[in-house]
A protein has these predicted regions:
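Acidic, metal/ion-coordinating pockets
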Residues: 1-202
């Protein structure tokens, strides 16, 4: 799994070939699903939803990316993966700040919503008992959003949550049905365990 920014801002050998070499490596590694990061939009939404998605053996997930002025998903929201007898629902979302990080011309036809609200909406769908809209035994969230500091910086989860902001929201407000959260975007190293609100699980 990946939390995004697999392409864009890459080494010259990859960027000069529109990151096809990077996509080829990720395909060879067997990447099964990825959230989109802001850099996936560097060449615009049409490039992402067309050339990049067609070349990728894994889905580019963006549950909070919508067609302009609507709540219609512009990208796949989730992937269902098999792990033994379990079906794992993987939900992806990208930072809501993406419009400030990429060229507006390339994303003029889409909107970016609240990532936590989008993940929670899809989590409810995947656990509502209706197999016609997808069902999962285990839920995982991939957020292209992250903590401002990591373990090597001396940060703890409590400190990061006390700082508030987007990271605190995704930890505190993601639906308790989600068993694990993977994050990205901020280029920080950490692996924290936290109580899941309303449950006795971490």
């Amino acid at each position: 799994l990946s939390a995004g920014d697999n392409i864009g801002a890459s080494l010259f050998a990859s960027s000069v070939a529109k990151d096809q070499p990077t996509i080829d490596v990720l395909n060879a590694l067997g990447l099964q699903a990825s959230a989109v990061g802001n850099h996936e939009f560097d060449r615009g939404f049409d490039d992402l939803s067309g050339r990049v998605s067609e070349a990728s053996d894994y889905p580019q997930l963006g549950a909070n990316v919508y067609l302009k002025g609507t709540t219609t998903p512009a990208l796949p929201e989730y992937a269902l993966l098999q792990a033994g007898s379990l079906t794992v629902g993987v939900i992806g979302a990208v930072t809501e700040e993406t419009p400030t990080l990429v060229s507006p011309n390339g994303i003029s036809g889409i909107d970016f919503g609240d990532p936590v609200a989008a993940v929670n909406r899809v989590a409810a769908q995947l656990t509502d008992g209706d197999p016609s809209n997808g069902e999962a035994d285990v839920l995982v969230a991939l957020y292209h959003e992250g903590a401002g500091a990591g373990t090597p910086d001396g940060a703890t989860l409590d400190q990061e949550l006390a700082a508030g902001g987007a990271f605190a929201s995704l930890v505190n407000d993601t639906d308790p049905k989600v068993a694990a959260i993977f994050t990205g975007h901020t280029h920080k190293e950490y692996a924290w365990s936290a109580p899941i609100p309303g449950t006795d699980r971490t």
